[in-house]
Amino acid sequence: MTYLTLKPRFVALLSAIALVLGGCQSLNNKPDDSLYQQLGEREGIANVVEDLLYLIVDDERINQQFKGMDVAQFHHNLTDQLCELSGGPCTYTGREMRELHSDMAITNTQFNALAENLILAMEQNDIPTGAQNRLIKQLLPLYPDIRNL
């Protein structure tokens, strides 16, 4: 066999392998839910959010921003949002972040205070540090919309 007859066969073989592997990949196309698992699934996330709410109430830096809010709705929406961001089966159906925060004039200090409280709430619920970092990484893209930058 010559080089010219091997080349088309080699290309055909590589194409077939790529199709098979591509097909296998699409069969396993579910999102990575390992973070969701590490957060304790929906129940664990709901516990973190509940503890976060208590921390917000006690935090003079931010509690005025949350005055008058529907606590049950906030709990439900934030739980859904964290569940979805962590790869869980939930779907966040609340308002868009930019719209929701447009009239709040949130400062860096307030944003950081909420982040600190979220970390404290996760620590209170024995969430591993690696999972905490992964969740914070998922939340970072929301920063410009929350701050209305």
Placement of each model-derived feature along the sequence:
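Post-signal-peptide N-terminal segment of Sec-exported extracytoplasmic proteins
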Residues: 32-35, 39-80, 124, 130, ...
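Residue-level signal for pocket-adjacent positions within structured domains
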Residues: 30, 34, 57, 61, ...
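Bacterial N-terminal signal peptides that target proteins for export
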Residues: 2-14
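Compact alpha-helical subdomains of small soluble proteins
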Residues: 71-74, 78-143
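Secretory-pathway/luminal and periplasmic proteins that interact with or process carbohydrate-rich
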Residues: 61-62, 91, 142-149
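C-terminal motif of bacterial Sec signal peptides marking the signal peptidase cleavage site
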Residues: 20-23
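Bacterial signal peptide processing site
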Residues: 25-28
